[in-house]
A protein has these predicted regions:
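Boundary regions of SH3-family modules and the immediately adjacent low-complexity/disordered segments
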Residues: 1-3, 19, 23-26, 30-79, ...
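Helix-biased detector of long, well-ordered alpha-helical tracts
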Residues: 145-149
Length: 164
């Protein structure tokens, strides 16, 4: 079995033990790579590649084949069902800052990164893009609440802030 896997959800909580009742130690963002260390019922014990966190996730929302080309550069990027900036095509789903995606198709000001999932081009940049002004990045998170183990617009902690 191949041991490099990638998150296919906006983000997944990484639990200390194989239970939703246990403490969240970190989060895995869309496109983030991890290794499976152990399978336990409906849970995987994993180690994240970026920051080496170890914990448990449910056995869903992952893929083996993924080669990211771009990343999210805004606090959150709205996912559209179709490449049109109309209310009826907007979903209530977002990708958080630093998520990694693969651009599959471009249409006007939109890119497709998964089947029937589109992002506005203003929300992405090439995978190797480095923002030089860290203060601007930190200001993106200024009104985000504190969440232990968080790395997203829904809540962030001190280590999550340093990792972005």
């Amino acid at each position: 079995m191949k041991n490099n896997f990638f998150c296919k959800s906006s983000y997944i909580d990484l639990y200390e033990y194989p239970s939703y009742k246990s403490k969240v130690s970190s989060q895995i963002l869309y496109g983030e790579k991890f290794k499976i260390l152990l399978k336990k019922k409906n849970w995987f014990k994993i180690k994240t590649s970026y920051d080496s966190y170890i914990g448990y996730i449910k056995k869903t929302h992952y893929t083996e084949k993924f080669n990211p080309t771009h990343k999210i550069i805004n606090l959150k990027a709205r996912i559209f069902k179709y490449p049109k900036n109309l209310v009826k095509y907007k979903s209530n789903n977002f990708l958080p800052f630093a998520s990694k995606i693969k651009v599959l198709k471009k249409y006007k000001n939109f890119i497709m990164f998964d089947k029937n999932k589109w992002l506005h081009i203003k929300d992405i940049n090439k995978i190797n893009y480095q923002k030089k002004n860290f203060i601007k990045i930190l200001k993106l998170f200024i009104n985000c609440k504190y969440k232990w183990g968080g790395k997203t617009f829904n809540g962030i902690d001190c280590s999550g802030l340093l990792q972005i």
